[in-house]
């Protein structure tokens, strides 16, 4: 038997000491965060909802969890991650009805919108990741398996799931060199990733990054969001007010741009062009639409701007409008069906929103520069269906090519839109791949 070298023993001991210190420090950090949220809840509405929701967790679990049932636990941080996990939930309900679904959220923006999701048997917030709460939660639920969506690395949950030998999966994950797992000083955190039974990544680059730090429990399966947007399109939800406003398919139809998840920084980029081109129409779905936000949008675009909530009371308001503002939840992913060109917001701020929702309808998509975390932004541009911009001038150039009421612009819309749609269609199938690996073993 080979005697370990001193350097090897020293490295092993250093690693063991780091892990012994890391767990209590991490848990202390989570507890401190919890206290911080509680303090912030005095003035912050989102924090108030989070604290209020956490008070209800154990009552919800007591009422909804059937101790004799088998549960698949799916955790999504927020609404976007839920949409990524949704195709797998729907397939599970169809193919494996013997399982019940427990759905948890971290963010109020996910929980508040989907707390009554009909395909989940129980929906609640994820208890804070402290050892005591983790043990209590898993003792109560005792899931058959746990599925985390995209960016979820809750250290105590992962360790306890591993200790209890509960299969644990991360789906539609993306890894980048700038993440802390791959930094020299924090690379040792990579052992968290070994607690997953399997990690399903979106691309080969992510697999190679993980292999470089010794994580090999990885499959390249793609992104379930593509399956989700294809499903939304196939259901073909009709929105009569949008049809009346856009006059899609009618002789007097004018080019329509749909702006999804618009922020003030986005409006600074595109509003000026529309003032100069009265033979176009604009639909705006703001990311947030409180009264003050809507007032500012109406002031920016003037008398020709109508809110959907107003038009629902008097549909004739849209007949002479140039701008229609969608001031309600739940329509955006279907509303793209009524546009000729899409602009997806967030790229001039915190980060790009979902461009796949638009591209699936065979329309070209314009978006801002803060998109490096989204593989599809680069790939769609390479495919010829996406138009990344970095300035107002870039937007004007793209709009001049795609949005004019001319034959050449119509042809450009058709060609680039087809390329955007083809890109989406080339990415379908991630849900089936993941399902087969997890639930069709052997």
Residue ranges of predicted features:
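Nucleotide-activated sugar donor-binding and catalytic core shared by glycosyltransferases
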Residues: 1-442
């Amino acid at each position: 038997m080979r005697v370990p070298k001193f350097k090897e023993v020293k490295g092993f001991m250093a690693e063991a000491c780091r892990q012994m210190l890391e767990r209590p420090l991490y848990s202390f950090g989570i507890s401190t965060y919890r206290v911080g949220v509680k303090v912030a809840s005095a003035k912050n509405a989102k924090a108030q909802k989070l604290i209020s929701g956490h008070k209800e967790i154990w009552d919800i679990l007591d009422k909804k969890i059937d101790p004799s049932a088998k549960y698949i636990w799916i955790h999504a941080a927020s609404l976007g991650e839920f949409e990524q996990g949704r195709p797998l939930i729907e397939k599970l309900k169809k193919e494996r009805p013997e399982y019940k679904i427990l759905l948890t959220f971290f963010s109020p923006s996910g929980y508040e919108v989907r707390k009554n999701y009909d395909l989940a048997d129980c929906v609640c917030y994820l208890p804070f990741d402290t050892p005591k709460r983790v043990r209590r939660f898993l003792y109560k639920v005792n899931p058959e398996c746990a599925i985390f969506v995209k960016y979820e690395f809750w250290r105590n949950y992962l360790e306890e799931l591993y200790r209890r030998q509960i299969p644990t999966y991360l789906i539609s994950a993306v890894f980048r060199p700038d993440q802390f797992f791959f930094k020299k000083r924090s690379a040792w955190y990579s052992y968290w990733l070994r607690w997953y039974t399997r990690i399903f990544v979106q691309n080969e680059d992510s697999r190679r990054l993980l292999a470089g730090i010794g994580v090999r429990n990885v499959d390249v399966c793609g992104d379930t969001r593509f399956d989700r947007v294809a499903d939304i399109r196939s259901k073909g939800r009709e929105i009569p007010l949008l049809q009346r406003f856009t006059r899609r398919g009618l002789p007097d139809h004018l080019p329509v741009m749909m702006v999804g998840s618009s922020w003030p920084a986005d409006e600074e980029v595109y509003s000026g062009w529309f003032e100069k081109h009265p033979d176009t129409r604009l639909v705006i779905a703001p990311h947030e639409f409180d009264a003050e936000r809507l007032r500012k949008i109406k002031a920016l675009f003037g008398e020709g701007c109508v809110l959907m909530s107003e038009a629902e009371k008097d549909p004739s308001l849209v007949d002479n409008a140039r701008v229609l503002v969608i001031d309600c939840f739940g329509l955006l992913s279907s509303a793209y069906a009524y546009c000729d060109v899409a602009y997806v917001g967030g790229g001039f701020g915190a980060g790009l929103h979902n461009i796949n929702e638009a591209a699936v309808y065979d329309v070209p998509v314009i978006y801002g520069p803060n998109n490096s975390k989204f593989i599809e932004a680069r790939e769609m541009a390479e495919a010829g269906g996406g138009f990344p911009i970095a300035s107002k001038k870039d937007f004007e150039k793209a709009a001049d090519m795609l949005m004019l009421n001319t034959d050449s612009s119509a042809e450009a819309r058709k060609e680039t839109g087809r390329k955007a749609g083809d890109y989406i269609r080339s990415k379908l199938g991630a849900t089936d791949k993941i399902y087969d690996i997890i639930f069709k073993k052997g």
